Regions:
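Acidic active-site catalytic centers that drive phospho-/nucleotidyl reactions
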Residues: 1, 20, 43
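Conserved Rossmann-fold cofactor-binding substructure of NAD(P)-dependent oxidoreductases
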Residues: 2-15, 22, 26
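Short, contiguous clusters of charged residues that form electrostatic/catalytic patches at enzyme active sites
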Residues: 4, 8, 77, 106, ...
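Short glycine-/small-residue-rich flexible loop motifs, especially phosphate/cofactor-binding loops
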Residues: 7, 31, 83, 152, ...
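Structured catalytic core of nucleotide-sugar glycosyltransferases
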Residues: 10, 17, 41-44
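Active-site-adjacent beta-strand anchor residues
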Residues: 20, 98, 184
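Glycine-/Pro-rich loop/turn segments that contact NAD(P) or position catalytic residues
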Residues: 24-27, 31-140
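C-terminal catalytic/substrate-binding lobe primarily of soluble NAD(P)-dependent oxidoreductases
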Residues: 113-201
Length: 201
């Protein structure tokens, strides 16, 4: 989490783009280093703090929860605040470029632009079709995964956030080639970015 160390590393390679696949705790530090080095930025997940009990962060978080209408620890506001800095520097910052978020938003934007006159509802269904042979295994960092599934779920309805207790809405879905899976409504960052960029849905 040292901007100068990151700058030294970036400057030693002189890339056009830094692809951040570190933990989301590092997002802002890496964005700061990219700005300092004049390098474009891309990540796969939005920022969240490592220490959610830090009083300074907690005060900002409580205010944001009231304004946004959801209480998950992760949201795009921290990174969207960098938009003007990157624009002024003539740089690009692509946020959430994994599968979800990432590909899911690209599919939705493409469908809205090329396939449909109107879209009333977007449901994003994501399942793990693999089997690691363990009773518990995640596709990414276990701590982040547990934070996601233990946070209140949320969805947007009529332009407003609706928050629900964690894993309180469940449905079954039969996926081609994977089979029937239990699905739970979770809060996830693509809901926030889709709500901002496709406001009529």
């Amino acid at each position: 989490d040292d901007v100068q160390q990151l700058c030294d590393l970036i400057n030693s390679y002189k890339p056009d783009l830094v692809m951040n696949i570190a933990l989301p705790y590092q997002d802002l530090t890496i964005m700061d280093a990219c700005l300092a080095c004049g390098v474009n930025y891309m990540d796969t997940a939005n920022y969240e703090p490592e220490n959610t009990d830090d009083p300074a962060w907690r005060a900002i978080y409580e205010k944001r929860c009231k304004e946004a209408g959801f209480s998950a620890y992760f949201d795009y506001s921290w990174q969207w605040a960098y938009k003007k800095k990157f624009e002024d520097a003539g740089l690009t910052a692509l946020l959430g470029c994994g599968f979800d978020p990432g590909v899911t938003q690209a599919y939705c934007a493409y469908a809205a632009k090329h396939e449909f006159d109107t879209i009333d509802t977007i449901d994003i269904l994501d399942c793990n079709g693999g089997d690691h042979g363990y009773a518990f295994a995640t596709n990414f960092n276990p701590e982040i995964n547990l934070r996601e599934v233990s946070a209140p779920g949320s969805y947007m309805e009529n332009g407003k956030w609706v928050e629900i207790p964690p894993m309180s809405i469940k449905r079954e879905y039969n996926f081609d080639q994977v089979g029937q899976k239990d699905m739970y409504l979770l809060h996830h960052e693509e809901i926030e970015s889709l709500g901002k960029n496709l406001p009529d849905v």
